[in-house]
Amino acid sequence: MTLDVSRQDPRYNTLKHGFNLRWPSTDAQAAGRIALCEKADDVAPALQHIIDTGMRPTVRSGGHCYEDFVSNNPDGAIVDLSLLNAPEVRADGTVRIPAGTQNWNGYLELYKRHNLTLPGGSCYSVGAGGHICGGGYGLLSRLQGLTVDWLSAVDIVTVDRQGRAAPRTVDATRDPELFRACRGAGGGNFGIITAYTFARLPEAPREVALATVAFDWAAMTPERFAELLRLYGEYWETRGKDPDTWGMFSLLKLTHRSAGQIVMLTQFCNPDGTCRDLSVLNDFLARFRACAPVPLKGRPPGYGPAHRQGVGQLLCSKPHTVVRYDWLTATQTVNGSGPNQRGKYKSAYMKRGFTAREAQRIYTHLTRTVPGIDLSQSLLQVDSYGGAVNKTERIADTAVPQRASVMKLQYQTYWTSAADDAGHLRWIGDFYRDVYGTPDVSAPHAGTPYPGDRYEGCYINYPDVDMLAYPFWPQLYYGDGDLYAFLQRVKRRYDPNNIFHHAMSVRP
């Protein structure tokens, strides 16, 4: 059964938007209706009705699309998959994860019933539908790879040239090109994914250590900041490539100066899923002594409401805090999504550590002010990357070409009032263009992390419509090889009428 939510429904004002409250940009830009599908079998008929009535369909699983690709849909309809949320392990051992499953619910179900996990994100409310097909990653990805690396089949509803919606299951032998496209090209391109199947999944770690360390902005000189970035990037470019470090994932949150502290969060386990030997973690943390680390004040940014050291074993408290947890408790501890606000995001993959010029430009923008604009929720988050992700054989059978990077960057800024939109967008835009300016990037590609010796482009699950200003934007997200041309062929075959489209969807 499909539940139809129209503008007259009391639920409409809540369901018309997702996580990013910038969208819909106005009430007139909002979708005319929301179709809440209760079962996977409801999706094709719901989609058929939308097509037959001349409406444009957009798709929502968890509602975390950063841009206006879903909620901005005037006179269109959102197909909402959030009720398709019950993972199952079948008799043959395969795991089926419906598209509406949110990260935390999926982790709970897989762990409690089967001691399994998926190397997905730490944001608890992100839905599997968009997360997985965009190449979703998380704190276990250096150890276990990307979510799409484990994928064995996809249930998807496509629309043929005659406008007929029909479900199909695709895998390495049935519609293999569409299957590959669903392994990283991102959502809203080829059809409506209703579920993912995994022939097997990794066991969850038995325990992990969570380390937090902070650096006071008040004591952060340009030189100390540059040294912090040099040490962090150098580690992942060198020592971080060794397999005994792959169980370690770090998030360096380079906050705006007005936030008070820079914070580094690190999760660690040995490759066997235990914390019996913490020498790798201790060596990593010790490298930052010259940067004047201090204990964290308050709750770490990005930690969920369950953050409480009392449930774990405190191993160290100064200058950094290290707590040993069972894996599920640790996952709950870091599973923050943050409040629903207005936001803007940008991304970059880095194949090498930071240069002095990059560090100087980052410092400049994190310490400058914009009159009348609160930047205390603005930051550049630098995630460790690589490890099991960088298995080059995955380039040929997934749609994720970035398999040589050692860090993954997400530029973020959050605010609450539409009146502040322009100030925040200008700040983050200037920041990004400056970091990737010449001479670090060749003139034709200046302002972007174009694939080359230092960078590997951008992440499609962090879409940024500003990149559309560059004619080479597909190469930023899909590499400068033949992947985008391949995706265009898949698009023409499986969505010949371009039913599924948005500003950054694959062009026919």
UniProtKB/Swiss-Prot annotation:
<dbReference type="InterPro" id="IPR016166">
    <property type="entry name" value="FAD-bd_PCMH"/>
</dbReference>
<keyword id="KW-0560">Oxidoreductase</keyword>
<dbReference type="GO" id="GO:0071949">
    <property type="term" value="F:FAD binding"/>
</dbReference>
<comment type="similarity">
    <text>Belongs to the oxygen-dependent FAD-linked oxidoreductase family.</text>
</comment>
<keyword id="KW-0274">FAD</keyword>
<protein>
    <recommendedName>
        <fullName>N-acetyl-D-hexosamine oxidase</fullName>
        <ecNumber>1.1.3.29</ecNumber>
    </recommendedName>
</protein>
<dbReference type="InterPro" id="IPR036318">
    <property type="entry name" value="FAD-bd_PCMH-like_sf"/>
</dbReference>
<feature type="domain" description="FAD-binding PCMH-type">
    <location>
        <begin position="26"/>
        <end position="203"/>
    </location>
</feature>
<keyword id="KW-0883">Thioether bond</keyword>
<comment type="function">
    <text>Catalyzes the oxidation of a range of monosaccharides in vitro, displaying the highest activity with N-acetylglucosamine (GlcNAc) and N-acetylgalactosamine (GalNAc), with a reduction of O2 to H2O2. Acts upon the C1 carbon of the GlcNAc or GalNAc molecule, producing the corresponding lactone, which can spontaneously hydrolyze. Its biological function is unclear, but its main function might be connected to extracellular production of hydrogen peroxide to compete with other organisms through oxidative stress, or support the action of peroxidases and peroxygenases.</text>
</comment>
<dbReference type="Pfam" id="PF08031">
    <property type="entry name" value="BBE"/>
</dbReference>
<keyword id="KW-0285">Flavoprotein</keyword>
<dbReference type="GO" id="GO:0016491">
    <property type="term" value="F:oxidoreductase activity"/>
</dbReference>
<dbReference type="InterPro" id="IPR006094">
    <property type="entry name" value="Oxid_FAD_bind_N"/>
</dbReference>
<feature type="cross-link" description="6-(S-cysteinyl)-8alpha-(pros-histidyl)-FAD (His-Cys)">
    <location>
        <begin position="64"/>
        <end position="123"/>
    </location>
</feature>
<dbReference type="Pfam" id="PF01565">
    <property type="entry name" value="FAD_binding_4"/>
</dbReference>
<dbReference type="InterPro" id="IPR012951">
    <property type="entry name" value="BBE"/>
</dbReference>
<dbReference type="InterPro" id="IPR050416">
    <property type="entry name" value="FAD-linked_Oxidoreductase"/>
</dbReference>
<dbReference type="InterPro" id="IPR016169">
    <property type="entry name" value="FAD-bd_PCMH_sub2"/>
</dbReference>
